Amino acid sequence: MNMDRREFLKKAGLGAAVLGIGACAPRVLGDDDAKSRAVPDGKMASHYDGIGLLGYGCMRWPVIEGEDGRSHINQAEVNNLVDYALEHGVNYFDTSPVYLEGDSERATAEALNRHPRGEWLLATKLSNFSDFSYDNSVKMYRKSLEIFKTDHVDYYLLHALSGGDDFKRRFGDTGIMDFLLKERELGHIRNLGFSFHGPDSGFMEMMELHDKYHWDFVQIQMNYVDWTHSGKGNASAEFMYGELDSREIPIIIMEPLRGGRLADLPAALSDVLKAREPKNSLASWAFRFAGSFPRVKCVLSGMTYMNHLQDNLSTFLDFKPLTDEEKELLEITAEQMENYPLVRCTGCQYCMPCPYGINIPAIFKFYNGNVNAGTYVVSKEQKGYAKIRRKYLLEYNKSIPGVRQADHCISCGHCVSACPQKIAIPHELRRIDKYIETLKREDF
């Protein structure tokens, strides 16, 4: 850092807010402020011809409760979102056979197939996690083509690789990689790449395969926290970007908001960013960070609601790369986030279903939301202690049915290997359950 942190934060407008983290008052923050931003006229930002810089992640489509009492994708709303996105220059749609309990591809295809094939780019994945046999993998690939009524996939990904051994087990030894290379040669796969969750060493193993397979693109988790604070077991985005950039491999970015967490910052941190750009959402800072790197081909966002889409469009249709000073401010924000007892969950739901019925993502989301809002009890002497305690316990029971709460975890470990963020899920569930029991007993 070229500047003293206190001096820098003072210049940002609210330095004391960040430095005095423990003093933040209860306050609910989120991306609702996105509603106030108008979508400007203009052309979608782009670093590569033919592809908009903002892409649509199709893992978080809106759902409604059906007559059977279960949640179903709201197809009418998906259609509206897709229409609006295409109208404003979003043309890259990323899905997978396993998203939304296997229904994402169908819903996405139903919306997109109402438009000419040349107007949209399809990105989907070979998500052969449990059965990675040749026959099953070919079946999964052909099923995607069938669902989208197309003879080609624009961007096809080997889904969620962690390194060379994982690649060899799922794609190399099975012979499916030879099949995919032939499909690329025939033009049925226009671009072949992979998405990655794993350590530096695993990423380098995949880079060493570039000379043999010539990756057309790679999808990585990149945001201003994971740039240098990626957490135990995962390569930093800075490292991966550098390796890809040096090989001139285009990059697709996933989790630019870290599962929505960067659109819902603790009050002390959000106040600093709001002081700098009062009219802009917290999410816009994260998207400007992701879109400021020239090797980035597309930044994915799982835009569940129209206000999310409109807010992101207002960022990318009038795109302004971050200044060096703004990058420094976000690095300080990322460092300060380490001081909060948050769970690093992005809500991807790869850990689900839990064999014992625990709603893992919902528990983490509820807990993180209260930490961010300042409604996290530290001691009985805390201002508003009784009200905060009662509210937390009531809303926890209301949000998450008793049989799906953290105290039902038996530490079977079924979820651990599935987590891309390498979260020690049973440990975190025990920690949250212990906190809840402390609230009940008032034993601080």
Which residues make up each language-model segment?
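Conserved, mostly hydrophobic/aromatic
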Residues: 56, 93, 108, 122, ...
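N-terminal binding-site loop/beta-alpha segment at the start of enzyme catalytic domains
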Residues: 2-120, 179, 185
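Short catalytic-loop micro-motif centered on adjacent basic/acidic residues
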Residues: 92-99, 190-195, 298-300, 419
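Structured C-terminal cap/extension of enzyme domains
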Residues: 91, 214, 239-444
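Short, electropositive alpha-helical surface patch
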Residues: 106-116, 208-218, 270-271, 313-319
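Conserved beta-strand positions
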Residues: 56, 95, 124, 155-158, ...
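Glycine/proline-rich, positively charged
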Residues: 64-65, 131-252, 257, 264, ...
